C-alpha cells in the first residue's frame, strides 16, 4: 500500500490491484492513526478531508503495558543491577511534518536523535532498527549499551516487542505514568536545549539527518556544571568509547567552536 500511495495511486486502485480485503475507510483510518509508513500528506485526497479534532495516536492498551509500568521501572532500579537508563521521546516540528525521535542517556545527559518522516509506530521501529544496525556494524550491541529504556505513553511507542528486540538480546521498555513528564525530566531538559537550534514552531521538513547530528553534536559539546564542567560527550565517550558516539551520529566539537543557536545553519 505504501508504495502505491507514494506513486500517487488512488486507494480503490491499490485495493483492487493488491486484492486487499479491507475498505477504503479502514485504510484511511490506518493511515491517520499512524499504523502505515505513510502520512496523510502523502495521499492527496486525505489532506482535503476535514481532520478530527484530535490528532493523537491511539493510546497503548493497558494489557500491553503489564510489566512495563513506571513502578516496574523503579523496582528494577532498586535491585541495584542498573545505574543508568535511556530516556526516549519525540519533538514535534510543524503539525503533520517530520518529527525528531530523541534519546537521552540518564547518567550524563548525552543525547542523540533521528529524523522521522512522521510520528508513527512504523517510523519509530524503523529508525530504532537502523540505530541497532549501525551499532552492530561497529561490533556494539544496543541492548548491552542501553538495557533499560523509559518513555511516555505516546502511541508511537506502542510496538513494545519490536522496540525491545535486538540481535543479541533485548532491552526492557518502561512507560512513565500518564501526565508525568517529570519522571523523564532529563530528556525534557535537553529538549529545551534542542529548541536553541530549532525554536518552537520550526519545521523539520527542510532539515536532514546530518543537520540533526550536527546540532546534537554541538549540544553534547556544551560544558555543564552538573557534570563537573565536563561535556556530555566527554562523559559518554569515557563510559562507552568514541566508536559508540560515532555510530550514533555524534562527533566531537571543540569547546570554543560550540554553537548554541540557529546560526549553526546559517550559510
Question: Which residues does each predicted region cover?
Answer:
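Secondary-structure boundary/capping micro-motif
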Residues: 1-203, 207-208, 214-217, 222-224, ...
